[in-house]
Amino acid sequence: AFAGVLADADIKAALAGCAAADSFNYKTFFKACGLSPEEVKKFFAIIDQDHSGFIEEEELKLFLQTFSAGARALSDAETKVALVKA
């Protein structure tokens, strides 16, 4: 979804930075990817799988897999924190 927008090295670095359980911070992740605020908006439209205009908990849980199919799912705690702070 982000081919040509993000460098593979940036994606790998961002994923490595949150590989450990309960280490995900969405601001740090987007910064590591080099996403601009406009690109972040586009990204959220992509992970809104049901096109409801909202990011549901289950969609957010699989957030990292949008960047790499082998990435881990977010924990319940990480998902809840991201929903509250986003």
UniProtKB/Swiss-Prot annotation:
Molecular-function GO term, any one: calcium ion binding
Top-level division of the source organism's lineage: Eukaryota
InterPro entries given in the database record: EF-hand-dom_pair, EF_Hand_1_Ca_BS, EF_hand_dom, Parvalbumin
Residues bound to Ca(2+): D48, D50, S52, F54, E56, E59
Keyword terms: Acetylation, Allergen, Calcium, Metal-binding, Muscle protein
Keyword match Endoplasmic reticulum: no
Sequence ranges assigned to domain EF-hand in this UniProt record: 35-70
Residues recorded with modification N-acetylalanine: A1
Cellular compartments per GO CC: cytoplasm
Keyword Protein transport: no
Function: In muscle, parvalbumin is thought to be involved in relaxation after contraction. It binds two calcium ions.
Family assignment from sequence similarity: Belongs to the parvalbumin family.
Note: Is regarded as an important allergen.
Protein's name in the database: Parvalbumin beta 3
